[in-house]
Amino acid sequence: MNVSQQIEPRAAASERNMADAIRFLSMDAVEKANSGHPGMPMGMADAVTVLFNRFIRIDPSLPDWPDRDRFVLSAGHGSMLLYSLHHLIGFADMPMAELSSFRQLGSKTAGHPEYGHALGIETTTGPLGQGISTAVGMAMAEQMMASRFGSALCNHFTYVVAGDGCLQEGISHEAIDLAGHLKLRKLVVLWDDNRISIDGSTDLSTSMNQLARFRAASWDAQAVDGHDPEAVAKALERARRTRKPSLIACRTRIGKGAASMEGSHKTHGAALGDKEIAATREKLGWPHPPFFVPPEIRAAWAKVAARGRTAREAWDIRLDASRSKKRYEQTIRRQFDGELGDLLAKFRSAHRTRATKVATRQASQMALEVINGATALTIGGSADLTGSNLTMTSQTQPISPGNFKGRYLHYGIREHGMAAAMNGIALHGGFIPYGGTFLVFSDYARGAMRLSALMGLPVIYVLTHDSIGLGEDGPTHQPVEHLAMLRATPNLNVFRPADIIETAECWEIALGEKNTPSVLALSRQALPMLRRTEGNENQSALGAYVLREARGNRDITILATGSEVEIAVAAAERLQAEEGIAAAVVSMPCWEKFEVQDLAYRRKVLGDAPRIAIEAAGRLGWDRWMGPDGAFVGMTGFGASAPAGDLYRHFGITADHVVAEALELLRRAYSETLPIGARIGPHPSAHTVRSSQEA
C-alpha cells in the first residue's frame, strides 16, 4: 500500500474550520495575556491542520509512546499554535483554562514551549534554530533504533515547523548540511515562508534562495501555497516517500485571516487588539465568544487523537509479539546492565596498581573502552576532533548514510549542530549521546548546551585541551573563562578530573545522571595517578574530597582541580619538608556535586585553616570556596603560544609560586613576627582541624 492510500481524506471546508479554531484560540490567548505572538499560529494554522488531520500519529492518552511521530515547533515564539493543537486533540493537561492562562506564572502555557512543562512537548524551543537542529538528532535516533529493532517497532517521522528566523540562524546551516549528508529521510520541515521578520520584510536582511540552499545540501525541496490544504497534503505525501530529508516551503501570510493586519509584521509579537479581533471574527464567520470551540469542530479534532490511539494500539500488539520486546524496553529506558559499575571499579583498581600516568583525555578513552564494551546505549561522536578528543573506541563503528547500525557520529566542524543533535538523540530515547570538541569551542555550542541543562537531558560533553596545557596552539585555543561560564549554568555538572582514577569516576557519575547533562574537561598533557588509597568508593561523586591530609593539624588547605592537583600535591609536600607547614590538598573534580553535600562534610573537607586555590583558568567562582581571605593561583588574562611547561612557568602556575603564595597568605592570616621556617599553628580564631587519621 502506498503512502497516499494510507492517508484518510478530509474535506477542505472542515479543515478550514479546524484551522480557524487554532487562529481564534491563539488570538484570544495572546489578547488576554497582552503578550505573545499571534501572527505565526494564524499563518501556519492551515498547513499544520493538514499535517495533524491527515498524517501525524500521536496518542494524547499516552504522550510518551516511543513510536509516535515527533512534532517540533522550532519557531517556538508561536507557542499558541502548539498549545491550541494540544487542547484540541485532548491532552489531559491542556484544558481551556490553561489557554486562558497563557504566559502566566504557574501555567502550563509558557511563553515558549518547554520540555517537561506540559505533556507532548518534544523539546524546548524559542532560541531560533534550536528546534530544527534538535530534530535532526531525533531523526538520527529514529534511524538508529530502526536499524536495531526493525520498522515494526520503530517507524515514525519527525516533523518540524520552522520560520525564517530559524533558517537564518547559523546553527541551521550545520544541521541542514548534516541531515542531508546522512539522508535522514524521515525528517520533514515545514517552513513558514511568510517573508516577515520583526523589523519588517525579510528582504531587509536576506536574499537567500532557501530552496536552492536545501537542495545543495541534498534535501528534497518543494514550494506550495501554505493556505491550500490539498497542495500541502500532496507535498507531505511526496515528503514521506522520498529518500532524503524534506523541506516544504509553505508560502503563507503572517496573521492570516486578520481583518486589516494580515501580512503585517505588526502581528508577529503583539496582541491584535479588541477591535481587530472583533473584525476578524466577522470576516471569518466565527461568531463564538473567546475561548470557545464548537462541538462539531472538537469532534473533527478528536478524530486525530483516535487515529493516533489506533496506531499506538497496533504497535502495542507488535511489541508484545516481538522477540526483542525485553531488549527494546531496556533500550528505550536507557537501562544499564548491572555489571558496568563493577567493571569500572576493576578498571580503577588496575590502574591504581600500575600508577598509570596519562592525559585525562586518554584516560577517558580508556574508560570508554570499558563502558562501550559493557553497554550498547552510548553513541559517541566528535566535531572533527576524534583523534584529539579520543572519543572513539573499538566498539564504536561510524554511522554513515544508509548505515545506522554504528555507534559513532562524525559531526564535522559543527560544534553547535553536534550539541543540538545530541539533545535530540537524548530526547528521542534509547541512547546516551556523548560528543567531543576542545573546551574553548564550547563557545560555539553554548546555545544548545544551555538547553541540555534547561531540559535536564543526560548528554555528555567531552571537552578536551582544557587549559594553557594544550600549549603551542595559543590563546585562541586555550580556555580561560570557559569553566566559569559552564559552572555558572544551572543544572550542569562540570567535571575536571585530576588523574585516571577520577576520570573513570566522573564517567560513572555522568552515565548515572538522569536529568543533568555533564561536561568532562580533560587535559592534553599527561598527569600522574594521584589517588593511591584503595577502595571502591567513588570519591568524585562527593564533588570534592581530601586527597592528601596534612600531617597533624592543618596550617593551610590547597584546593585544586584537574591538572593543577598535581601542582597542589607538590606544593604541599614542599611546604611540609621545607617550611614545616602542614598542608592538606583537596581535589575538587565537580563543584556542583560538592555544593549539594551536607554542611558538615563541606566543613570537614575545606577545614578552618587559610585556603589557597589553583586552577589554570580565571578566578571567577573560586572565592566561595577559598573564603574572603583566600589566595588564588591561576590565569588573569589570555594565554600565549608556547610549550605547555613554559606557559605554566610564565603564568606562575607552579609549585614554587604556590609555596610563595601560601607563605604570604599565612603571614597575613597569622603574624608577621614568626620566622619563615617556624611551625605555624592554627589560626587563633579557628577550630582545630585534625587529619583523617586523627579524626
Swiss-Prot record:
InterPro entries: THDP-binding, Transketo_C/PFOR_II, Transketolase-like_C_2, Transketolase-like_Pyr-bd, Transketolase_bac-like, Transketolase_BS, Transketolase_CS, Transketolase_fam
GO biological process, one term: pentose-phosphate shunt
EC number from the UniProt entry: 2.2.1.1
Lineage per the UniProt record: Bacteria, Pseudomonadati, Pseudomonadota, Alphaproteobacteria, Hyphomicrobiales
Cofactor note: Binds 1 Mg(2+) ion per subunit. Can also utilize other divalent metal cations, such as Ca(2+), Mn(2+) and Co(2+).
EC top class, as a word: transferase
CDD domains: TPP_PYR_DXS_TK_like, TPP_TK
UniProt binding sites for substrate: H37, H268, R361, S388, H465, D473, R524
Species this chain originates from: Sinorhizobium medicae (strain WSM419)
Pathway assigned in UniProt: Carbohydrate biosynthesis; Calvin cycle
Site, Important for catalytic activity: residue positions: H37, H268
Subunit structure: Homodimer.
PANTHER family: TRANSKETOLASE, TRANSKETOLASE 1-RELATED
Identification of the protein by name: Transketolase
Coiled-coil region: none
